[in-house]
Amino acid sequence: MQRNEMDDAGRCGMALTRRRTLGAAGATALATLAGCLTDDGSDTREYSLSIDRIERSPVEHALYEPDDSPLFGDPAETALSNVLPDGRHTTYGYKPVPNDGYVEYEGSYFQLIYVVTGRQQMERQLVRVETVPEEQVPEDAILVDSLERPSARIIKILHSDSQSGGGSSTAELLRDDGYVLRRPSERESRLARGELDGRVVTMTDSGAWAYRVDVTTETITETAHTVMATEVATSQSEFREVVFGSRIDAELTPAELPADAREILDEAIAGGTYTEEAPKTAAFETLLAALGLGAVDTAANGKLLWYDDELYRYGLYSNTTEDGS
């Protein structure tokens, strides 16, 4: 429902300073009032609060567990077996487990902490690709999805970088436009064995987005990342307090919020998103302040909320739209 909804379009003489987008009912109301809005080409800032329920407890959500893949899981398992409870594990150029991650070991809880312990020159294989025009794709070109996971993942990363001109989120995984084979599965892949060197790999069956693969061996300087574990709790109840102190961004009960702010939060939980246009209502401002988002101007995401004995992930996003567009 819309609060403070105007009775009819005849009241457009009053300054209409805010609108709330609340599904179909809200859209209909906005359409009715559209004639009231000045078509001066001015921009309108829109704020969207997104929130999703996490179907795990805060303790379960905080604990890191390696997956079962050889590519990521095996190096992580090796690191944990060397680190827990009081060891060290060093890798060069990559981190096999998350920094600051929490793990459980024999009833106690530990936090993983990395330190840089030096650099070392070593020989590494680097994979680069060169675009091949579709009309020059050979009949024996290899479809990327037919490759084993380590090789396919690397080609897809290089494809993404090529298509974005180096502006994709995967660019940080590359070194001078090349992917360095570091993880054990990568160093045992078809790319590492030279089976794909000089071959053309396509991203689709039609031959679109084709690349010639180039694998070289170079001497590069790798950073030494050493991970250790620090015990933070000796029981689950103690660890829960650690999690709430370090991972939970907002802890609220329904009684702590004014009724109008609580209504907005419940609406966002039910629908996944709640949106307002600037200027924000007082109730929305109150809720954002309670969530620690009062000073956010553009975006904040990945936040965690404990509300009414449930765990949620939330974020705030804003964008500017042109009125009348």
Residues of each region from the PLM?
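Terminal disorder- and signal-encoded targeting elements
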Residues: 1-325
